[in-house]
Amino acid sequence: QVMKAYGAELDLTPRALGMKGSMARAEEIAAQTPDAWIPSQFANPANPAVHRRTTVEEIARDFPEGLDYIVTGVGTGGHITACAEVLKERWPSLKVYAVEPTLSPVLSGGEHSPHPIQGIGPGFVPDVARPELFDGVIQVAPEDAMAYARRSAAEEGQLVGISTGASLAAVAQLRPEMPDGSRVLTFTYDSGERYLSVDALWSD
């Protein structure tokens, strides 16, 4: 609705085709449209490069004593890859864990299927991602992602989206392995206001 408000024409692809279907359709449209340009965020090396210059340096400033764990979802793969590339060199004991949906365990070697955790689990390993730098992959079920998104709002006053709930659920899964006093970072990707129409998210 936001894009339509700005005057965009929407070309919706079948949900069953997932992100790959959307990307293929975008390529078709670009081929038919003069001077069209696709950012290609899953493959564009500028994606992790910008995170190396910005996100990574912000984290380093905010955590001068370093971190023990970074737990975060994989959408395009840009920010987790940049964090792993740079921060693991600065803080050799840092462990970086990727988060993916149980319904799309591609990083774990499984098959993709449609899932409601928007923003992560695109159904393939992005070209810019470097999974060999990850210390592990944590799978999160949709109901757990939604439960932690609700908890974030009710207990912390932070209205977050489903993918953020997935990362919080992943931290909770990993918590028993973490020594007391560990410094842990995850990310809030977007506001829960975008998901107010998702009935399943707010019905516990």
Residue ranges and their predicted role:
Residues T72, Q139, G161, T186:
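Redox-cofactor binding/interface segments in oxidoreductases and associated redox assembly factors
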